[in-house]
């Protein structure tokens, strides 16, 4: 009896397009047309921008939404590439980790306006007189608001790969390249996807600051939802703010349905478990493409290419065999590496000291450190309160995939809500009731960053192995014991990632949140953020540098002394497998 040959695309079915092919093709062509149209708008001369570039006419919002979304998707793609490289090197190399992770702590705490100050001139000089230079500067600013939490998530996942899976990869003699694509990336996928969602939502807050590019004495305003919101706030036009929020909601629903929900449903196969979960996430877009014939047939060559790339045998031409390298050589390299880091840190500190000592006294440093401790207290209290609220809610959502599907766009919209739109409510309330700004301006710091905790806890609960839940049920673990013995240890690494990024984001937001204004009314809280904001407005560059330096040092020390020991505890004691 002749053997039956199974065709790869559709198990022997006809290649004739069906109705689903037509629908999918229309969807693909429509998205590509929008991308091409948006791409054409970024390669025009600066003089081609309308004056004014942004109008509060709501009929312009569809085009503004398209251009802002393309900028954010471009930044997400760059953030993903950065994450795959940076997080992997930090997780795999002990010596690189000593530099890269503290550097990441510093980068996420540096205000986004600090990046804009140094990068706008560079990107504008690459394409002088073209809109593309301003677009790249805007994309880079959005990138700095998206990349850090994705990198922390990937780093945490690689460091917590189950030991039995590591042993299996060694027994199959996988190269480092093969292990990366077959083990590290799949295991990191749940957390990375939810952090990518958070990055997209968090980017909405920063487009308000990044779509108005200042070069010298001139300002280039790029058409987009962010610049629309900034103009609406400036003119105190509540109707325009409402139109912008509605546009944001529609855009979030669109990319949730077309991008994130299909990815979540597709990535469900990477869950680390031995039994099938009862309720799996679904996506009508993914189901649509799975029902096509011609498109699936056309995708076979691409699948073959990606499969062959993931199987490449990248190996070092020569290296010390495992366990053969002399111990003295390893120790010598460690000493030289630490010495190099110390010399570099001393040089940077000396240069900063040389710049500041000419204009500032030691009392100024003590004042900045004291203000930093006040802001640190705010951050710690707010992170603790946000954890008490969002950890139980995140676990409840993450363990129910169907509920997570419904909550997903709502959570993305809440995370995308620009915190500066809440300033009028807080300012009016504080003035009306005579409240203390030092206390009641503090929630503005966590308004946009609390979602890092929620999204990471949802990711951890979503990736929680179903067989462990069944084992807990068979042992009749309920109530407090279920939380302490089962769920909290399972989501702990994800929570730490969310808390670290929320903490760093809160430091960044303190510059905006500790000084809130609406119209002619301005309120100020005591803290390092208000110190930096005041120095920036007055043009006091030495105090700006001092404030940012104190902020970076405080964040790094706090992460080293508090968050990193907790992260190491999770790796050592709460690792699956």
Model regions and ranges:
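Generic hydrophobic transmembrane alpha-helix motif, especially the helices
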Residues: 105-145, 412-449
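Glycine-rich helix-loop "coupling/hinge" segments at transmembrane-helix boundaries
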Residues: 205-238, 508-545, 550, 574-577
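Transmembrane-helix boundary motif in ABC transporter permease subunits
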Residues: 75-104, 382-411, 424
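Transmembrane alpha-helices
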Residues: 177-210, 243, 259, 443-447, ...
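Membrane-embedded alpha-helices of multi-pass transport/permease systems
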Residues: 81-86, 93, 100, 137-140, ...
């Amino acid at each position: 009896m002749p053997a039956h040959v199974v065709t790869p695309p559709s198990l022997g079915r006809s290649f004739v397009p069906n109705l689903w092919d037509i629908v999918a093709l229309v969807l693909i062509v429509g998205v590509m047309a929008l991308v091409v149209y948006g791409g054409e708008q970024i390669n025009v001369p600066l003089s081609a921008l309308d004056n004014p570039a942004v109008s509060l006419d709501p009929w312009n919002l569809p085009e503004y939404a398209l251009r802002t979304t393309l900028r954010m998707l471009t930044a997400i793609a760059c953030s993903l590439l950065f994450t795959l490289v940076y997080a992997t090197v930090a997780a795999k190399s002990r010596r690189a980790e000593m530099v890269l992770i503290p550097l990441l702590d510093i980068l996420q705490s540096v205000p986004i306006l600090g990046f804009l100050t140094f990068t706008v001139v560079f990107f504008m000089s690459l394409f002088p007189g073209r809109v593309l230079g301003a677009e790249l500067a805007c994309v880079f600013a959005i990138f700095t608001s998206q990349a850090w939490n994705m990198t922390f998530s990937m780093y945490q996942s690689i460091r917590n790969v189950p030991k039995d899976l590591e042993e299996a990869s060694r027994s199959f003699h996988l190269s480092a390249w093969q292990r990366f694509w077959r083990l590290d990336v799949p295991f990191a996928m749940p957390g990375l996807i939810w952090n990518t969602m958070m990055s997209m939502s968090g980017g909405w807050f920063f487009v308000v600051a990044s779509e108005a590019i200042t070069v010298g004495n001139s300002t280039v305003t790029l058409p987009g939802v962010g610049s629309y919101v900034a103009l609406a706030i400036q003119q105190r036009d509540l109707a325009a703010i409402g139109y912008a929020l509605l546009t944001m909601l529609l855009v979030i629903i669109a990319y949730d349905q077309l991008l994130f929900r299909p990815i979540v449903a597709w990535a469900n196969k990477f869950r680390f478990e031995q039994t099938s979960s009862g309720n799996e996430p679904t996506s009508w877009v993914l189901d649509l493409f799975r029902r096509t014939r011609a498109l699936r047939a056309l995708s076979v060559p691409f699948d073959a290419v990606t499969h062959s790339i993931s199987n490449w045998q990248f190996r070092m031409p020569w290296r010390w065999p495992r366990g053969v390298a002399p111990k003295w050589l390893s120790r010598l390299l460690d000493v030289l590496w630490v010495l190099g880091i110390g010399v570099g840190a001393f040089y940077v500190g000396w240069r900063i000291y040389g710049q500041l000592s000419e204009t500032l006294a030691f009392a100024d440093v003590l004042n900045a450190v004291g203000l930093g401790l006040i802001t640190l207290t705010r951050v710690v209290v707010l992170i603790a309160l946000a954890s008490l609220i969002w950890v139980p809610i995140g676990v409840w959502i993450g363990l129910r995939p169907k509920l997570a599907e419904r909550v997903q766009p709502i959570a993305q919209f809440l995370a995308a809500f620009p915190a500066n739109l809440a300033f009028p409510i807080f300012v009016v309330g504080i003035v009306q009731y005579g409240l203390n700004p030092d206390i009641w301006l503090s929630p503005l710091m966590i308004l946009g960053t609390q979602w890092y905790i929620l999204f990471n806890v949802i990711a951890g609960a979503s990736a929680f192995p179903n067989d462990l839940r069944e084992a807990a049920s068979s042992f009749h673990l309920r109530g407090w014991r279920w939380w302490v013995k089962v769920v909290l240890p399972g989501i702990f690494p994800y929570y730490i990632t969310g808390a670290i990024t929320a903490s760093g984001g809160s430091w960044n937001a303190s510059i905006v949140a500790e000084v809130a204004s609406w119209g002619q009314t301005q309120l100020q809280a005591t803290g390092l953020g208000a110190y930096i904001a005041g120095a920036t407005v007055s043009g006091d560059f030495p105090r700006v540098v001092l404030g940012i330096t104190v902020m970076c040092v405080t964040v790094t020390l706090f992460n080293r002394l508090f968050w990193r020991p907790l992260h190491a505890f999770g790796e050592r004691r709460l690792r699956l497998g």
